[in-house]
């Protein structure tokens, strides 16, 4: 089975627990296995389901109690430097570094990934075009709006042309226009790479997403095409994604 799944981005048998005062260790993820496909996937789950934890493990910002993450032939434990160079992560609480321009902020992301100064600068210029911020390249990044700063974060994830992008609640707190713009960017960048976007908001899931994965009770409860997930909703549902999600996590039909 694993030989068939080794190509691509694979979480394999991941277990992760957190210690909570007076409660001991509480399991967040339990022997979770998931093969994230090429294209844009919505990682859907209620608050506290472990979505941020799963993405953090995928970016090697957290290490699981057991299991591993692999990208094609690379193992996140044994080949961490090479693995990190091909995976980009935008945490939910993205903030611009004070004092840096937009271009400098994006180039800094490339430098952190091991790119040379010249390559980082060149990559930043190209990435800003992809997120439609080239006209603001020399503005202080900290002066941009929340939606614009999220796009700076996305450019930082794109600067080294990563094969996998892990975006944690990237549209949280944005107005409808900014959300729509961000989803349009996802369509443009997701054609030839793996993009995983976490969300708890079923209303956020549109045709910008090709796939849906539902994280519930420590494991992936659904993994498939968007249309297949919507088809699980009761007949006549006005909000099929929401209905399918609620039915899945409550066990109701």
Where are these predicted regions, by residue range?
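A short, flexible loop at the N-terminus of ABC-type nucleotide-binding domains that lies
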Residues: 2-11, 15-31, 80
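Helix-to-loop junction immediately C-terminal to a conserved catalytic motif
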Residues: 59
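Conserved ABC transporter NBD signature motif
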Residues: 67-75, 82-83
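Conserved ABC ATPase signature
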Residues: 99, 140-144
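Conserved ABC ATPase "signature" region
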Residues: 107, 111, 118-136
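Catalytic Walker B motif of ABC-type/P-loop ATPase nucleotide-binding domains
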Residues: 165-169
């Amino acid at each position: 089975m694993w030989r068939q799944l080794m190509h691509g981005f694979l979480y394999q048998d991941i277990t992760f627990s957190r210690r909570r005062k007076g409660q001991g260790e509480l399991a967040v993820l339990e022997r979770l296995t998931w093969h994230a496909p090429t294209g844009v996937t919505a990682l859907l789950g209620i608050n506290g389901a472990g979505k941020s934890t799963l993405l953090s493990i995928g970016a090697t910002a957290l290490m699981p109690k057991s299991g591993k993450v692999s990208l094609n032939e690379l193992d996140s434990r044994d080949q961490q430097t090479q693995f990190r160079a091909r995976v980009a992560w935008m945490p939910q609480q993205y903030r611009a570094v004070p004092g840096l321009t937009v271009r400098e902020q994006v180039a800094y992301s490339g430098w952190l990934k091991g790119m040379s100064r010249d390559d980082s600068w060149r990559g930043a210029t190209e990435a800003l075009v992809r997120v439609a911020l080239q006209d603001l390249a020399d503005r202080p990044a900290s002066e941009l709006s929340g939606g614009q700063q999220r796009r700076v974060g996305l450019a930082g994830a794109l600067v080294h042309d990563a094969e996998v992008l892990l975006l944690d609640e990237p549209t949280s707190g944005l107005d409808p226009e900014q959300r729509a713009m961000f989803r349009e960017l996802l369509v443009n960048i997701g054609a030839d790479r793996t993009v995983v976007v976490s969300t708890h908001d079923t209303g956020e899931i549109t045709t910008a997403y090709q796939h849906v994965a539902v994280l519930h009770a420590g494991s992936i409860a659904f993994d498939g095409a968007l249309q297949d997930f919507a088809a699980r909703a009761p007949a006549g549902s006005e909000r099929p994604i929401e209905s399918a999600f609620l039915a899945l996590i409550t066990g109701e039909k």
